Amino acid sequence: MDFRPDQVVARIRGAVEGALTAQSVLGIGGALVLILVVIALLPDRFTRGEGKTATAVSSGAAQALPAALPGLSPFTPAKPLQFSGRVTQVASIGNDVGWGQVHVWIDNGTGALQEISVAPQSYLNQIGCPSFDGARISGIGFLFDAGRPNAELYAKSVLVGGRTCKLRDDEGLALWMTVQ
């Protein structure tokens, strides 16, 4: 049998000639493209059958509880702690890597210096916070790493020179991240 592409194409044309018009071929092609677009826009949970919500049932009751969201870990919020003392040292840490943060060390009368992470100098200037050099300060802060010896306290607010400087919210998140 002699196999030549032009003869195969001619046979196919002869078989479909008259059965399909150019408009019907375009219509079928357009419908297929539309179906593919609709399938691509459907959420994965419909196309993969993953739309079921996971629940957990406690052993003592038949009440369904929602499953924990992926990526979240339970934690115990840090309790606010009060601090006060005279500033013995002021340093800006992290300027060389782009996130400069003012830290102060205070003598709180216990014989050991306490390190307090304050805020970037640019934020302190923006809110009009006075200089810490040699000042007597007091405030509220969070100790996030209580297990580490000499862990720094993250100041929520500091009273310095008669002015209260608000630095973090109740969860310890930096207020300078939201200032325009």
From Swiss-Prot:
Keywords: Biomineralization, Magnetosome, Membrane, Transmembrane, Transmembrane helix
Gene Ontology CC: magnetosome membrane
Induction: Part of the probable 17 gene mamAB operon.
Knockout mutant characteristics: Normal magnetic response, smaller, widely spaced magnetosomes. Near wild-type localization of MamC. Deletion of approximately 80 kb of DNA, including this operon, leads to cells that are non-magnetic, lack internal membrane systems, grow poorly, have reduced mobility and take-up and accumulate iron poorly.
Bilayer topology: Single-pass membrane protein
Location within or outside the cell: Magnetosome membrane
All ranges on the Lumenal side of the membrane: 43-180
Cytoplasmic side: 1-21
TM regions (residue ranges): 22-42
Major subcellular location class: membrane
Family label: Belongs to the magnetosome MamS family.
Miscellaneous remark of the record: This bacteria makes up to 60 cubo-octahedral magnetosomes of about 45 nm in diameter which contain membrane-bound crystals of magnetite (Fe(3)O(4)).
Its job: May play a role in magnetite crystal growth and size.
Name this polypeptide is given: Magnetosome protein MamS
Organism: Magnetospirillum gryphiswaldense (strain DSM 6361 / JCM 21280 / NBRC 15271 / MSR-1)
Gene: mamS
